[in-house]
Amino acid sequence: MAKELIFGHQNPDTDAIGTAIAYSYLQNKLGYDTEAVALGEANDETKYALNKFGFTAPRVIKTASNEVDAVMLVDHNEPQQSVSDIDKVKVTHVVDHHRIMNFNTADPLYYRAAPVGCTSTIMWQMYNEKEIEIPQDIAGIMLSAIISDTLLLKSPTTTDQDKEAVVSLANIAGVDYKEYGLKMLKAGTNIADKSEEDLIDLDAKSFELNGSNVRVAQINVVDLPEALERKDAFLKAMDEASKREGYDMFMLLITNILDSDSEALVVGSDESKAKFEKAFNAKLSDSEVKLPGVVSRKKQVVPPLTNAFEA
Amino acid sequence: MAKELIFGHQNPDTDAIGTAIAYSYLQNKLGYDTEAVALGEANDETKYALNKFGFTAPRVIKTASNEVDAVMLVDHNEPQQSVSDIDKVKVTHVVDHHRIMNFNTADPLYYRAAPVGCTSTIMWQMYNEKEIEIPQDIAGIMLSAIISDTLLLKSPTTTDQDKEAVVSLANIAGVDYKEYGLKMLKAGTNIADKSEEDLIDLDAKSFELNGSNVRVAQINVVDLPEALERKDAFLKAMDEASKREGYDMFMLLITNILDSDSEALVVGSDESKAKFEKAFNAKLSDSEVKLPGVVSRKKQVVPPLTNAFEA
């Protein structure tokens, strides 16, 4: 069987990288020949998790078709979030927990999606269904992915299935998930030694909303005032990125992981900003607005933006 | 929990109707409130199977949004094969074995697809994963769906998983699958008492191929010469349907289920016919051509047509 690459989305987070590693292990057990790779460097949080469970970061690729004819996707399906030459390879498998958008294939494929908090929760179910034993390190990296995506089970995307998976995986991994989880999340909140350009690209995704190219970035912090001291520099970096990449709107969600509140910074045309304000029923003041309780891009940001841009 | 409708594609076959019934039973066991319906009348083969296992044909609906806010799809995902107001309801679940095309959602959903011969094979796996006991009549209708889609496991779409499912389901249903299967398939081959207009619409699907609207219909027979005596009337009906519905090409695949060969009739522009000939590397003679061994629209017709229309 020809080798296939498995990867998550661009600007990978712990789910994108952790679930790729877990899926590759599972598929290889089932007779496939796969390698988990990544579409970017691991962030600090992911590095902490990889290190904790004894993994090295997956190799970073820029294109896939120079290596393989077929790939498997985790934690994404939208082509603009995938490898740059996704149209030149065949997608044979997808495991994801996002909406399906602009994902078209010529042939039938394996597709497994569920509206749960993390792709690793689906992966945990797949291991159980296939009755493949989960090694301790794989359990640890899947646990880390779920903690990351659900902000320690506090995000509104969290389902009972995520909670079950966390308890089961923490048991196999041999860690106290609350204690470990908070350490891991905090490892991802050190923004002091990173430039604004880097911070707005660490966990950023593009969405085509009714013809508009909308960028939504998110950073996790434990000290919101510290982050907002750099507001002008953030806005400048977002403005420059928008001009360079052609974004119609750029939104940065700065989330305090300790109290699950966020502050949003927004740059874009007056028309885009009006749509943003409509989406969240909130007025921007000097490009900034509080979004109390908003922590999930997928569940609390993209749907209202989609509705506002389509109205 | 609000009621949801479950249905397969337009011009329903035994998979579309049988798997909808089986999925509704499974989901209701899991706590959902669902009803299996159909987007058209059951054909003769499906009626035979429904009758054999004690089911009445599901209620036929033309629209969904007048009844429910949310639906579950089986055996299709492409919007033009679905209910006419699919854009007005939320799709919460899909179980399918086709390519994914033009299927976009605003929110995450349950999506389960695999490149196997029949949707009921995936459904059988889902019952097993959820450890829900399959009643005898549900096993019978799922068995019928797999026999129908795989032409008694002889279609090139057939996988080992389909074969396993057939053996397991036949055992639960208490039938000899070969004997029953041939009787069921033959029940669908009586074309004598149907008009050409009806026959070209019984099992027909539309595909958008690079901007062209291509219709592919299939009928199963046991006596190919009998069917070809009506060739001129078939061509006339296909031509009229094309003008009425705006098809750029209409292809009718007449398949002899006993020897797994087909004869194709084709109407359309010279340009479309040239693409057809390129797709199958075969010359049409008086709008007709033999396609030896071709029995699967999904695996042996749509992919070569897609390639030819996109070249």
From Swiss-Prot, chains A, B:
It is found in: Cytoplasm. Keywords: Cytoplasm, Hydrolase, Manganese, Metal-binding. Mn(2+) 1 binds at H9, D13, D75. Its main location: cytoplasm. Mn(2+) 2 binds at D15, D75, H97, D149. Its cofactor is Mn(2+). It is an enzyme of class 3 (hydrolase). It catalyses: diphosphate + H2O = 2 phosphate + H(+). It holds the Pfam family DHHA2. Binds 2 manganese ions per subunit. Signal peptide: none annotated. Its EC number is 3.6.1.1. GO terms for cellular component: cytoplasm. One of its GO terms (molecular function) is inorganic diphosphate phosphatase activity. InterPro entries: DDH_dom, DHH_sf, DHHA2, DHHA2_dom_sf, Mn-dep_inorganic_PyrPase. Belongs to the PPase class C family. This is Probable manganese-dependent inorganic pyrophosphatase. The gene is ppaC.
